[in-house]
Amino acid sequence: MATVSTGSLIFIVKKNSPMMSKLVFFWQNREKEFRDFGGFSEKSVYFCDTIDNRKRLILVVINREVLLMTFDAIDQLAVNTVRTLSMDAIQAANSGHPGLPMGAAPMAYVLWNHFMNINPKTSRNWSNRDRFILSAGHGSAMLYSLLHLAGYDLSVEDLKNFRQWGSKTPGHPEVNHTDGVEATTGPLGQGIANAVGMAMAEAHLAAKFNKPGFDIVDHYTFALNGDGDLMEGVSQEAASMAGHLKLGKLVLLYDSNDISLDGPTSMAFTEDVKGRFEAYGWQHILVKDGNDLEEIAAAIEAAKAETEKPTIIEVKTIIGFGAEKQGTSAVHGAPLGAEGIAFAKKAYQWTHQDFEVPAEVTERFAQGLQARGEKAEQAWNDLFAAYQAEYPELAAEYQKAFANEAAQVELEAHELGSSMASRVSSQQAIQQISEQVASFWGGSADLSASNNTMVKAETDFQPGHYEGRNIWFGVREFAMAAAMNGIALHGGTRVYGGTFFVFSNYLLPAVRMAALQNLPTVYVMTHDSIAVGEDGPTHEPIEQLASVRSMPNLNVIRPADGNETNAAWKRAIAETDRPTMLVLTRQNLPVLEGTKELAEDGLNKGAYILSEAKGDLDGIIIATGSEVKLAMDTQEALEAEGIHVRVVSMPSQNIFDEQSAEYKESILPAAVTKRLAIEAGSSFGWAKYVGLAGKTLTIDTWGASAPGNRIFEEYGFTVANATELYKSL
């Protein structure tokens, strides 16, 4: 029997059997049994109902030690401070979403001030901090209020400038823009997949670096989502993956308010969320009253006690709690107005000024989140110092992994006369990079044999083998890319993922978010053209190149042979603040003359002269990928007729666009207007390089089902046609 005394309360753990115990307490000589919140174990949670007007008490059993947790009026004042700061910021901006902050503030407060191990003084520099993602990014005013109260570099003045030009408080959270924000969110559902990626990274790094007595990677990933997030397909893909992977340190707090922008969720969302997530392999916990701080805390403890399953805590809330129109879509996405705010503040019994933070709330955050975070980080620093002494090589590798420095690798060159698909030369590069960059890992959306993404002699990332470097994302392209974003945001690894290029459409929203967040993810997109052949137009990319090239801050590289593929991978792995998309062939490509010597420098400038004209320059043929060989053959045919042309390989338009005016003029002189671009994709975007006087040999229709070489012939990708097209200039 274990006894814990706190004031006039005495708590006793009674062991009824070796496997079972129950908690009782004596209050004025009356015995009251605590309700079991999940079954007694080494880590369990119990709570009892209110007794004699006392607030409900929570007992937490951790390693059979009993801890007391309770909440008081200051905690409730802190919750209301989060609400009022959010309301005031939205009103000042005359723009924003008050419903979520007003309804979800209790769960967010309990999580932040009573559970999360974060240190505002060091912000995102402490690698073992807990992570929090606001997947429902429209609730950003709540996040900013929490960040301010927690002590991050976010002032009341910043809250007053919510959604204004140049402010630290944009409409949706942006990483690297606002101190303490872990991920850029807003497009619903993606934040959940980001959280899955972060939990994957935590599990992988823990398996790789932790040693007995040295759990240097040991943190939780929390995300807050709403009904809309769960309607999005990407959240379902990600939840399925997380359940399979048994990511026990992943916890979703579900703001279940039954309201969407259009009205009640009953109009479109009536499924059994509990049943769905349990089918995925998750633990589901229901909190019936979203204003009950004790019940929320008990649920979070129960979530942390489950180590074999991710947990979704469904918290039943009232959207816009306290507002005159609470519980309706009217409070979802528009300011309440002065009268509406006054009504809500009266409901909260709020007696302070606009944007005011009561001193006792500031003190409560100092005693809670700040003190706990500083203590936790100092304990981790001490642990890591001992780890460095015991495992110096691993410690150095850990520090290097989190430094996010450009990786430099050496790749074996491809010799003239050899031939292989660029997806195969990419696989060789992946293998060599994995041997030189220990933090490098990745996989494919169920196409590893086709994308050639698997690293040989490495284990698979699976439950019980989280050290594995081959990730099986399954047929979940969107979740793959969004989880990759979470992995990259977590830090400590370099991740890549592959699929067919035609399926890039499935994952572009996540690629966009990677580019927006400056994440150095790598996308291996194979089967890049009509050369796919027999599978037909559903699997033959046409518009994809033009689409991805239009995306800011994304390196799109379509290499012409093995040497350009090597150069592309070197560039990709050296990036620290930009994603890269490698567009690779299914069919074999011969190694071209000159690429061994010119490709690396040329690719890093986006375009280069691969073969100069043999006489006075008549014109220029520009090509990418598999069509560079056709350009070279066309040059030879034209040369036989006394027409001297230059062949420019342009593996990356966007990198070329970033070069100096002098370099671009040296490659594409303005005076040379006879230009032909050859690419097995859309003509869209090529006018920029060929000009009004130029022409393109491209494809502005759908592909066909036939052997790839036959399709190329039918679409005019022949030396004869290219020669005549050039001569028509």
Swiss-Prot record:
Pfam families recorded: Transket_pyr, Transketolase_C_1, Transketolase_N
Enzyme Commission code: 2.2.1.1
GO molecular function, one term: transketolase activity
Keyword Magnesium: yes
PROSITE patterns tied to this protein: TRANSKETOLASE_1, TRANSKETOLASE_2
Top-level EC class as recorded in UniProt: transferase
UniProt-annotated binding residues for substrate: H97, H332, R423, S450, H527, D535, R586
Record-annotated active site: E477 (proton donor)
One GO cellular component term noted in the UniProt record for this chain: cytosol
Residues bound to thiamine diphosphate: H138, G186, P187, L188, G228, N257, H332, F503
Annotated site, Important for catalytic activity, chain positions: H97, H332
InterPro entries: THDP-binding, Transketo_C/PFOR_II, Transketolase-like_C_2, Transketolase-like_Pyr-bd, Transketolase_bac-like, Transketolase_BS, Transketolase_CS, Transketolase_fam
Cross-referenced Gene3D superfamilies: 3.40.50.920, 3.40.50.970
Binding site for Mg(2+): D227, N257, I259
Cofactor: Mg(2+); Ca(2+); Mn(2+); Co(2+)
Catalytic reaction annotation: D-sedoheptulose 7-phosphate + D-glyceraldehyde 3-phosphate = aldehydo-D-ribose 5-phosphate + D-xylulose 5-phosphate
Listed GO biological process terms: pentose-phosphate shunt
Cofactor: record remark: Binds 1 Mg(2+) ion per subunit. Can also utilize other divalent metal cations, such as Ca(2+), Mn(2+) and Co(2+).
Entries under NCBIfam families matching the protein: tktlase_bact (TIGR00232)
Function summary: Catalyzes the transfer of a two-carbon ketol group from a ketose donor to an aldose acceptor, via a covalent intermediate with the cofactor thiamine pyrophosphate.
Similarity field: Belongs to the transketolase family.
Subunit relationships: Homodimer.
Name under which the protein is recorded: Transketolase
Gene (name only): tkt
